[in-house]
């Protein structure tokens, strides 16, 4: 996995921007269109948001553990498996986006208090091949970069579904 090497300030900016951008992209889109996939086998905007939320849960918990414990060992969890333990795929887009926005506000409040050394707190991640040492900054970068791709995907999905309706 390749994660862009972003400074903490850029991570914070991107993490704050994504919920706002999602709200802007979907503000005038009917609920039915947010549930529609652009073509068979592709995700609807709602499914992409559910995936974004699943990633935010999984990787956000890793960040929380690294801040609460000294060098914890964390078992890797796949957001694609974790999503099955949630109701995210069953939720309507707008309430799901509100919940995501609230969760993001809470994460940003925690991250805003970090001093530079705290961004470098570590965990050993096991269960997905070779054990890896990851930092709070790494998970922030991963989350920001991964979401950036999926926010763009939602924008493309909304445009594609709009054209077919």
Predicted regions located by residue number:
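A glycine-rich, hydrophobic loop/mini-helix early in the fold
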Residues: 28-29, 39
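Acidic/histidine-rich alpha-helical segments that form the ligand environment
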Residues: 15-18, 83-120, 141
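Extreme N-terminal tail/first-helix region
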Residues: 1-17
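Short, contiguous alpha-helical
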Residues: 35-79, 108, 119-165
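Acidic/His metal-coordination segments adjacent to aromatic residues that form catalytic metal sites
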Residues: 3-6, 42-45, 82-96, 128-137
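Alpha-helical packing segments of well-folded alpha/beta enzyme cores
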Residues: 11, 18-22, 55, 59, ...
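A generic structural signal for well-ordered alpha-helical segments enriched in polar/charged residues
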Residues: 20, 24, 28, 65, ...
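Small-residue-biased structural context
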Residues: 12-14, 19, 86-93, 136, ...
């Amino acid at each position: 996995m390749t994660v862009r090497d972003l400074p903490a300030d850029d991570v914070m900016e991107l993490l704050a921007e994504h919920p706002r951008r999602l709200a802007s992209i979907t503000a005038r889109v009917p609920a039915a269109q947010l549930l529609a996939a652009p073509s068979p086998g592709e995700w609807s905007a709602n499914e992409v948001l559910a995936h974004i939320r699943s990633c935010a849960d999984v990787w956000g918990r890793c960040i929380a553990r690294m801040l609460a414990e000294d060098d914890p060992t964390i078992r890797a969890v796949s957001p694609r498996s974790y999503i099955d333990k949630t109701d995210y795929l069953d939720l309507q887009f707008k309430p799901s986006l509100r919940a995501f926005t609230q969760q993001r506000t809470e994460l940003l409040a925690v991250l805003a208090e970090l001093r530079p050394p705290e961004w470098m707190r570590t965990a050993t991640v096991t269960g997905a091949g070779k054990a890896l040492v990851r930092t709070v900054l790494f998970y922030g970068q991963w989350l920001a970069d991964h979401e950036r791709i999926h926010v763009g995907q939602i924008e493309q999905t909304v445009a594609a579904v709009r054209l077919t309706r």
